């Protein structure tokens, strides 16, 4: 048994963990690292040039158009974005509604679970960008207060 102190949100917990086959895992890891490091140094120079252009080209084309519509929120407003991808089951507010911090704005279904999306602060709903049945991606703006 090994003991660890784990800090979660400022609270320290003492955790005991039982090692199961720990010696077997540690032995192959040590020889693999030195063998990979010398082999990677000469080979890394050639492959590094090929992968770098491919990832740079793909993200530049796709995220740029998606970011511009999401960033069009009025100054001084609060945006409520999707914390995870999912499907909008219901929208509980409409433009002009006054909401308080913690009020449920909409229900987002993700991984077969219904998640209540709540107002982060008091305000008035100025825009609702989703409808029931819409699919959203992580970071999509759903409501503007």
From Swiss-Prot:
GO MF terms held by the record: glutaconyl-CoA decarboxylase activity
Pathway linked to the protein: Amino-acid degradation; L-glutamate degradation via hydroxyglutarate pathway; crotonoyl-CoA from L-glutamate: step 5/5
Region (Disordered): 52-82
Keyword Ion transport: yes
Residues with PTM N6-biotinyllysine: 112
Ranges of Low complexity composition bias in the record: 57-75
SUBUNIT field: Heterooctamer consisting of two alpha, two beta, two gamma and two delta subunits.
Listed name of the protein: Glutaconyl-CoA decarboxylase subunit gamma
């Amino acid at each position: 048994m090994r003991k660890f102190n784990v800090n979660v949100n400022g609270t320290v917990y003492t955790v005991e963990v039982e090692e199961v086959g720990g010696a077997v895992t540690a032995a192959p890891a040590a020889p693999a690292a030195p063998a990979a490091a010398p082999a990677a140094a000469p080979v890394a120079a050639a492959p590094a040039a090929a992968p770098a252009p491919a990832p740079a080209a793909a993200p530049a084309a796709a995220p740029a158009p998606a970011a511009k519509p999401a960033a069009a929120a009025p100054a001084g407003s609060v945006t409520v974005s999707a914390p995870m991808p999912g499907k909008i089951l219901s929208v509980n507010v409409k433009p002009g509604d006054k909401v308080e911090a913690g009020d449920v704005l909409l229900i987002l279904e993700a991984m077969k679970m219904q998640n209540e999306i709540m107002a982060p602060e008091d305000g008035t709903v100025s825009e609702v960008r989703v409808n029931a049945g819409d699919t959203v991606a992580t970071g999509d703006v759903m409501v503007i207060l």
